[in-house]
Curated annotation (Swiss-Prot):
This is Probable anion transporter 5. Ubiquitous. Belongs to the major facilitator superfamily. Sodium/anion cotransporter (TC 2.A.1.14) family. Residues 1-23 form the signal peptide. Inorganic phosphate and probable anion transporter. PANTHER family: ANION TRANSPORTER 5-RELATED, SOLUTE CARRIER FAMILY 17. The keyword Transmembrane applies. It is found in: Golgi apparatus membrane.
Length: 432
């Protein structure tokens, strides 16, 4: 089948799916490559935590500006610029754990560049995706994150073993360039004739205007957005989701290496299972949400609350029992359940900003993702400090108690966040 025969909105969804996939290959890849290089150089866990968390400082700084830029310039252009910037940085900067200053600057630049990605994607999707396909198409796009993480965990340790840690940077830069060329070739802004007739089919309002400079969208209701309890319900859950995700993504390699004394290079494809599980559960969650809504089984509000609550509470239980398991299979099982149900919960909070503010989807996503990025800064850096403190008590990190508080913190946050979402979220449009 020719690409021209496929509805353009599905082409856009596929390309944005690939973009999130490539981004998370980069994030997992840096964690794997840097862990190997830093351990070989004798870098301590606290310093590792600082370097790993530096990305999130830049990422946090560019979330809201990314939403603003996508709103004013257009998500398609901003997304391309982001890919060009982070790919160039990966290509040009050498991986040397002893050159701390250079690594800090490089990770800040990559973080700033990637911070524009998700606000841009959601601005593009808000223009292309009709309400009755919203949950599943947005979930398909974001599921690329987890497939990327799974592929990174599967392929990149072998690449490190064969070619060294530096080769990971070059592979990631190449992937970014290839995606950019595909985006230039196939991505377009939606003409009115391309819009699916969602409203006529009885599934809600029309899509956004295609002209981002239209006079009706020049005024952004910042005060109303920042004082909205439903927005804060999304923000709190985004913080918790990313705290759990980034702690596992950045420290699970160390947990296997030092906590269980298992080499990542020696593990089989099981190390990709937690992220592959996220990929599957994310898509399943989107289809369940759309089914419940379009079949009128539950309202949009109840659907979002139901999936968010189920996902976060089961993930909480899995996170808190994870350090009790001392085998490779046990840890793979617990981390798979935790990450899988967190991904299911994204059919609640992570699509909700398009329910309540479709016109300002990129802006609300930027605000929400800022909180998620702060979670990365806090969680990744705090974990390094907690592990250094544990070494003073237990002498090394192979003792299970060294890791208990690391996984209890995101577990408790999941419970708190699910309660906040139950109390304050809504599926109704509250911003014109």
């Amino acid at each position: 089948m020719k690409l021209s025969n496929i509805p353009q909105r599905y082409v856009i969804v596929f390309l944005t799916f690939l973009s999130t996939c490539v981004c998370y290959i980069e994030r997992v890849g840096f964690s794997i490559a840097y862990t190997v290089a830093a351990d070989a150089a004798g870098i301590n866990q606290s310093s590792k935590g600082t370097i790993l968390s530096t990305f999130f400082v830049g990422y946090a700084c560019s979330q809201v500006p990314g939403g603003w830029a996508a709103q004013k310039i257009g998500g398609r252009k901003v997304l391309l610029l982001s890919f060009v910037l982070w790919s160039s940085t990966c290509f040009l900067v050498p991986l040397d754990p002893n050159r701390v200053g250079l690594l800090v600057v490089a990770r800040l630049l990559v973080g700033v560049a990637q911070g524009f990605i998700f606000p841009s994607i959601h601005t593009v999707l808000a223009q292309w995706v009709p309400p009755h396909e919203r949950s599943r198409l947005v979930s398909i796009t974001t599921s690329g994150m987890y497939l990327g993480a799974a592929l990174g965990m599967w392929l990149l340790p072998a690449l490190v073993e064969l070619r060294g840690p530096e080769s990971v940077f070059l592979a990631e830069a190449l992937a970014g360039v290839i995606w950019s060329l595909l985006w230039i070739r196939y991505a377009t802004d939606p003409p009115r004739s391309e819009h699916p007739k969602a409203a006529a089919a009885g599934f809600g309002g029309a899509l956004l205007p295609t002209n981002v400079n239209h006079h009706k969208v020049t005024h952004i209701p910042w005060k109303k957005i920042m004082l909205s309890l439903p927005v804060w319900a999304i923000v709190v859950n985004n913080f918790t989701f990313h705290y759990a995700l980034y702690v596992l993504m950045n420290w699970l390699p160390t947990y296997f290496e030092l906590g269980l004394q298992i080499s990542l290079q020696g593990m089989d494809s099981s190390k990709m299972v937690p992220y592959l599980n996220m990929f599957v559960f994310s898509i399943v969650g989107g289809f369940i949400a759309d089914y419940l809504i379009t079949k009128r089984i539950l309202s949009v509000t109840r659907t979002r609350k139901f999936l968010n609550t189920v996902g976060f509470l089961i993930a909480s239980a899995a996170l808190m029992v994870l350090p009790m398991f001392r085998t490779e299979n046990g840890v793979i099982l617990c981390s798979s359940v935790a990450l899988g149900f967190l991904a299911l919960g994204r059919a609640g909070f992570a699509v909700n900003h398009m329910d309540i503010a479709p016109r300002y989807a990129g802006i609300v996503m930027g605000v929400s993702n800022t909180a998620g990025t702060l979670a990365g800064i806090i969680g990744v850096d705090l974990t390094g400090k907690l592990l250094e403190a544990s070494k003073l008590v237990y002498s090394d990190l192979s003792h299970p108690e060294s890791w208990r508080v690391v996984f209890f913190i995101p577990g408790l946050l999941c419970i708190f966040s699910s309660v906040v979402f139950l109390l304050f979220s809504t599926g109704e449009r509250i911003f014109d």
